[in-house]
C-alpha cells in the first residue's frame, strides 16, 4: 500500500526513515509506502546523519539531554525519535551513535476535541473529578489529553478556569522548544518539561499551587505513589495509560495497584474503528 490521495496525507502521523529501507508513513490505517509507485529509493546512513545534523543545527552536544533519551523536540511541535547504537556509561545511556532509524512525529493538535468531553468530568457541584484516559499505543491519548488540558485551563460558562500543572516528561504535550510551548494548553497552564513524573509532581505541588496535575503515560510504581501524594493534597489528576479497556487494567499488577489507590474517579476509553475514533466516558471502578 502507499499514500495516494489528499485524505490519506491529512491522516499521516509519522514519517519513518530506516537505513537501507524506503521511506514509509504511519497513518491510522497502518504503515504505508510513501512512494506512489511503491518504488521509493532506499534511505542511507548519510541521509539520517544529514537530517539529524539539520534539526540539531549541527550541534548535537546542545541536544544531548534529550538525544540520549531517544528523541528531539523540534520547532513547530514536531518530535524526532532516534534509534542507533547506545553509548552506555555507568549503567546509563550517555549518547547515541551509528544512527539507524528516525521517526518524525507530526503532532496532532485538535483544538476543540475535548470541549464536549470535559463537562462530563465534573461532579454535580462543579468539582473536577480525576480522570484516566485509556487506549492502545497510537490510539490518540496524547491528543485528547492535550486538548482537555487546554479546556480545563481556559474554563467555560459552566466551569471556572483551573490552574493546571503539566509534567511533560517526554515533551509530547506542550512540545516545548527552548522554553516555549509549541502547543496550545490554555492561559492557566504551567509546564515542567523533561522531568520524570515521580520527581516533577512533588516539585509543582511545592512551587506552583496547581488545582490539576496532568501527566502522559503512567508506567511505573513511583508514578502512582507521586499521584497518590497529589490526590492526598486535594489536587485533581488528569493522566493517560496504555490499555484498551477497563478490564485490561485489572490484568496487570501495576494497573491493579493504580485502581486500588482510588485516585481516579472517571475514565475515558478511546476506541478506533475503521480510522474513526470514539470516546466513552464513565466511572472508573476501584479494585479490591
Where does each model-flagged region fall?
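P-loop NTPase switch/communication element
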Residues: 153-202
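Conserved lysine of the Walker
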Residues: 141
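Hydrophobic positions on the alpha1 helix immediately C-terminal to the Walker A/P-loop
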Residues: 144, 148
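Conserved P-loop NTPase
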Residues: 89-98, 265-288
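P-loop NTP-binding catalytic core
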Residues: 60-127
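Conserved P-loop NTPase nucleotide-binding/switch module
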Residues: 208-272
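Hydrophobic anchor at the beta1->P-loop junction of P-loop NTPases
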Residues: 133
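Conserved small/polar residues in nucleotide/adenosyl-binding loops
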Residues: 1-6
Amino acid at each position: 500500500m502507499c499514500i495516494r490521495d489528499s485524505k490519506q496525507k491529512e491522516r499521516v502521523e509519522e514519517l519513518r526513515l530506516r537505513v537501507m529501507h524506503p521511506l514509509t508513513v504511519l497513518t491510522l490505517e497502518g504503515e504505508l509506502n510513501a512512494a506512489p509507485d511503491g518504488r521509493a529509493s532506499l534511505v542511507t546512513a548519510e541521509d539520517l546523519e544529514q537530517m539529524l545534523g539539520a534539526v540539531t543545527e549541527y550541534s548535537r552536544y546542545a541536544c544531548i539531554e534529550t538525544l540520549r533519551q531517544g528523541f528531539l523536540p523540534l520547532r513547530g511541535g514536531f518530535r524526532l525519535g532516534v534509534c542507533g547504537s547506545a553509548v552506555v556509561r555507568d549503567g546509563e545511556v550517555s549518547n547515541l551513535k551509528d544512527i539507524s532509524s528516525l521517526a518524525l512525529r507530526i503532532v496532532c493538535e485538535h483544538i476543540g476535541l475535548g470541549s464536549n468531553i470535559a463537562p462530563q468530568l465534573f461532579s454535580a457541584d462543579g468539582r473536577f473529578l480525576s480522570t484516566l484516559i485509556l487506549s492502545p499505543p497510537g490510539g490518540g491519548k496524547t491528543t485528547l489529553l492535550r486538548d482537555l488540558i487546554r479546556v480545563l485551563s481556559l474554563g467555560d460558562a459552566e466551569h471556572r478556569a483551573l490552574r493546571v500543572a503539566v509534567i511533560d516528561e517526554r515533551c509530547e504535550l506542550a512540545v516545548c522548544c527552548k522554553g516555549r510551548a509549541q502547543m496550545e494548553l490554555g492561559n492557566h497552564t504551567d509546564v515542567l518539561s523533561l522531568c520524570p513524573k515521580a520527581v516533577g509532581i512533588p516539585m509543582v505541588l511545592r512551587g506552583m499551587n496547581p488545582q490539576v496535575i496532568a501527566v502522559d503515560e503512567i508506567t511505573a510504581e513511583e508514578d502512582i505513589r507521586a499521584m497518590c501524594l497529589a490526590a492526598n493534597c486535594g489536587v485533581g489528576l488528569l493522566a493517560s495509560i496504555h490499555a484498551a479497556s477497563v478490564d485490561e487494567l485489572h490484568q496487570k499488577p501495576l494497573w491493579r495497584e493504580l485502581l486500588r489507590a482510588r485516585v481516579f474517579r472517571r475514565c475515558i476509553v478511546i476506541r478506533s474503528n475503521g480510522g474513526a475514533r470514539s470516546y466513552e466516558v464513565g466511572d472508573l471502578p476501584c479494585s479490591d
